[in-house]
Curated annotation (Swiss-Prot):
GO cellular component terms, A-Z: outer membrane-bounded periplasmic space; plasma membrane
Ranges in the topological domain labelled Cytoplasmic: 1-4
Disulphide bridges: 75-78
Alphabetized UniProt keyword annotations: Cell inner membrane, Cell membrane, Cytochrome c-type biogenesis, Disulfide bond, Membrane, Redox-active center, Transmembrane, Transmembrane helix
The encoding gene: nrfX
CDD domains, sorted: TlpA_like_DsbE
Source taxonomy: Bacteria, Pseudomonadati, Pseudomonadota, Gammaproteobacteria, Pasteurellales
Pfam families according to UniProt: Redoxin
Chain ranges on the Periplasmic side, renumbered to this chain: 26-176
SUPFAM superfamilies registered for this protein in UniProt: Thioredoxin-like
GO MF: disulfide oxidoreductase activity
Protein name stated in the entry: Probable thiol:disulfide interchange protein DsbE-2
Function: Could be involved in disulfide bond formation. Could catalyzes a late, reductive step in the assembly of periplasmic NrfA c-type cytochrome, probably the reduction of disulfide bonds of the apocytochrome c to allow covalent linkage with the heme. Possible subunit of a heme lyase.
Amino acid sequence: MNKKLIFFTPLFVLLGVCILLIAGLNQDPKKIASALIDKPVPEFYQANLHEPSQIVSPKEFPKQPFLLNVWGSWCGYCKEEHPLLIEIAKTLPIVGVDYRDNRQNGIKMLKRMGNPFILTIDDSHGELGLKLGVDGAPETYLVDENGVIRYRHSGLLDKETWQTVFLPKIEALKNK
């Protein structure tokens, strides 16, 4: 009896761990909600990408709904979504966070592809990304006029997601 218990206990523990791992792998990271939903953007003081002597904080954010877009010049999906951000910026302010990037590379990318951002934060060391809970770029946050995060999208922002997810949420914010 004791030998069976000694043999089967680790087997059941291993089986339980395997089930938990498989369940975790089946989760879509884009659907994992941020712990910051309905909370203010975390406090930070970081350099402006284009003017490193200028320190940026949430006090500089627009006083209307806006997007907070985490990107990097090294990120293929960031480059892919960039033309859509240029279009969105015509109707909605976007604040950019150049995440874990070389400052000069970020500036070169914006010169080459266009700059959709009203403000670009240099997060070359990832401090703001850590506070936001960023798990990779790109990530796009919808922030309300009070600086409160209302939605987080992890991964490529495409036209369909913009139209079916973001636009209704923005309309709801404007109508409240």
